[in-house]
From Swiss-Prot:
Chief location: membrane
Record: glycosylation sites: 2, 5, 75, 277, 325, 342, 453, 456
Subcellular location, record wording: Cell membrane
Role description: Cationic amino acid transporter which transports L-arginine, L-lysine and, to a lesser extent, L-histidine and ornithine. Plays an essential role in gametogenesis.
Membrane topology, record value: Multi-pass membrane protein
Gene name linked to the record: NPT1
Protein's UniProt name: Cationic amino acid transporter 8
Family per similarity comment: Belongs to the SLC43A transporter (TC 2.A.1.44) family.
Source taxon at top rank: Eukaryota
Length: 506
């Protein structure tokens, strides 16, 4: 029995080994400057790790702004509890605002990605990022330059990040894994504000604008050059584009077999399992290839976008992301309140967030093999549990909550990106990604109201218990539509498609 279990474990681990075929048509696409796809991926990982959504680790950003004295003039007197000060509340309110701008801009970024290409979209995004740090470097109370800086930070976050996702199409047999690797690199970017904070504390005699301009010249300008010279004018073609001819021939062969052979029981896998999925993929891929090669690309792409936007998987994933976004943003805003009994847990969160790339890569491997829907269900459970365990005033429960928060944050948007890539035509990927982010970002503004309402009537204590329980109940209810999403198998699982294709050919 033990040998049997060990054999199963060994076989499972062997099955999780990742292989990529360099001879696939998608892997042979021409790259800017003819750079090898692996070198391009490495550069993109560095680009992402240093300039992606750095404000997602809000605890570190908040500490940086507090240390450099942003909004310190709002404090009329000293506060024993910093979380009750006007300065702290003003800084905290920047988070949902920036996130709302970030995800609102995503819808425009999605259209730019699909219609003017990754290169120019990323250039615009890095331009916004540079403007953001220029405004943050200005120290004045006459104009709220901090607010303006975070507006540009929100505008540039996805505009600089989404275009680089096209690199995943150079690895067609592991594209979702590559997408989560890029997402893991984005998790590494959480270390940027903590690093800047460390530098500021290490060299307190340096003005803050030295640090801001250092970040601009050392990181952001090289990233702008990467966007200019190493990103393509048009997105790299997705897997569905290259699968069309093979799937059409497979479909025709199956039809010929079904007409010539009257014994249906001799071919159950073709009739019962394969035919529906293949026909659905053929229809989707026909749309992708015809739109890309057609004369009315922009019009047909937009029409297809509105068609798939009203489908069940699209609506379900948007509703889930709205709830997930509210939950994660609210958690980030109340960490000091959740763990006021033990501040060391907050320090642990600051350590866990930069290393959240590790679970992100692990989740990415499972997504590539089993699809994103099952990981989304797991993240739904983690989101409910991280709030409930945070309410238990015990160190062990607090550590569990911090770990669950790290896991949820590690695959924050990658879970959505991978599902959209697997479930919908690649020709509308940017627009679907953008509209999903738009809804998530707009509703994140609700977190500001939630934070303002967690103070009790005495006004000297914050209690997030009621809101946390309501969020947990919402996630429990969300299990039903997500389970339907999973059981209906909307995704095009890359590894399953390849294995089924090999079986049919055999």
């Amino acid at each position: 029995m033990n040998e049997s279990n060990c054999t199963k474990i060994v076989n499972f681990l062997k099955g999780m080994r990742l292989k990529t075929n360099p001879n696939l048509p998608g892997a042979k696409q021409k790259t800017p400057l003819n750079i090898h796809r692996f070198y391009l991926l490495l550069i993109i990982i560095i680009y992402t790790a240093t300039s992606a959504c750095i404000y997602f680790d809000w605890t570190s950003i908040r500490n940086l702004l507090l240390n450099v004295g942003k909004y310190e003039h709002l404090n009329i007197s000293k506060y024993a509890d910093i979380t009750l000060s006007p300065q702290y509340k003003k800084i905290n309110n920047l988070y949902p605002m920036t996130l709302a701008i970030h995800f609102t801009m995503s819808v425009f970024c999605g259209f730019l990605y699909d219609h003017i290409g990754p290169k120019f979209t990323a250039i615009i995004g890095q331009g916004f990022n540079i403007l953001s740090w220029i405004f943050l470097s200005i120290d004045t109370t006459k104009i709220d330059t901090t607010l303006i800086g975070f507006i540009f930070l929100g505008l540039g976050a996805d505009t600089a990040f989404i275009p680089i996702l096209t690199v995943s199409n150079l690895f067609p047999d592991i594209s979702t894994f590559i997408m989560t690797v890029i997402g893991a690199a984005a998790s590494l970017s959480y270390a940027v504000p903590a690093t800047l904070n460390f530098v500021y504390k290490k060299y307190p005699h340096f003005p803050f604008y030295y640090i801001c301009y250092g970040y601009i010249f050392i990181i952001l300008i090289p990233c702008l050059l990467v966007a200019t010279f190493l990103l393509p004018m048009k997105p790299f073609k997705g897997l569905d584009y290259y699968l069309e001819n093979d799937q059409e021939s497979d479909s025709k062969n199956k039809e010929q077999i079904s007409y010539t052979d009257n014994d249906v029981e001799m071919q159950p896998s073709l009739i019962q399992n394969g035919n529906t999925n293949v026909s659905n993929n053929v229809n989707k891929n026909k749309a992708t290839k015809n739109i890309i090669e057609g004369e009315n690309f922009h019009k047909q792409s937009i029409l297809l976008f509105f068609k798939v936007l009203l489908s069940y998987p699209s609506i379900c994933i948007i509703v889930y992301f709205i709830l997930f976004n509210i939950s994660t943003v609210f958690y980030g805003m109340v960490t000091d309140i959740y763990f006021s009994y033990n501040k060391s847990i907050i320090n642990i969160i600051n350590i866990l967030m930069p290393i959240s790339f590790i679970p992100c890569i692990i989740f990415g491997r499972f997504i590539n093999k089993y699809g994103a829907a099952i990981i989304i269900i797991i993240m739904n459970a983690f989101s409910a549990l991280m709030h409930l365990t945070a309410l238990i005033k015990h160190q062990a429960a607090g550590l569990i909550s911090a770990f669950l928060y790290m896991c949820a944050a590690s695959i924050y948007t990658s879970q959505i990106y991978c599902f959209l890539l697997n479930a919908f035509p690649s020709v509308v990927f940017g627009k679907l990604l953008g509209i999903t982010s738009l809804f998530g970002g707009m509703f994140s503004l609700f977190c500001e109201k939630l934070y303002d309402n967690i103070s009790n009537s005495s006004g000297n204590k914050n209690d997030p218990t009621t809101i946390s329980i309501l969020l947990a109940i919402s996630f429990i209810i969300m299990f039903l539509p997500l389970s339907i999403l999973y059981t209906r198998n909307y995704e095009k699982n890359i590894e399953s498609v390849n294995s089924e294709k090999n079986q049919i050919q055999a």
